[in-house]
Amino acid sequence: MTASERIILLVEDNEVNRDMLVRRLQRAGHKVATAGDGEAALTAMREQQPAVVLMDMNLPVKDGWTACREAQQDASIAEIPIIALTAHAMEEDKHRALEAGCSDYATKPVDFPDLLTKIAAQLDAHH
């Protein structure tokens, strides 16, 4: 499966941020699906089996922390790597994301080249 055939699920409730990231990911050759909250993210993960999930942590309905923990407890999606996206840049926030089951962590505003490197690392590690 090529990178262009693998779906990246972007979970972001801010429409401006979501649209900007979708455009940039598509320009980088990725197929992108979106969800606007943690509950919708879990549903999309089960239905679409994305290669990687980019998950904002501050989401309505169900926050990213909770969605990550629940994904880890669901055998059908537990192996899907999740990269946490958050404005919280403290080391304890990174530790919290990893404890919740995230595979990696990126801060906002997003350093796009760094994010692409993190995505590539997860794709290589899991496929």
Language model segments and positions:
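Conserved acidic carboxylate
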Residues: 12
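C-terminal output helix
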Residues: 22, 110-119
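Charged docking surfaces used in two-component/phosphorelay signaling
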Residues: 19-27
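Acidic, metal-coordinating helix/loop segments flanking the phosphotransfer/catalytic sites
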Residues: 34-52
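The feature encodes the CheY-like receiver
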Residues: 60-61, 78, 90, 109
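Active-site residues of response regulator receiver
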Residues: 56, 86
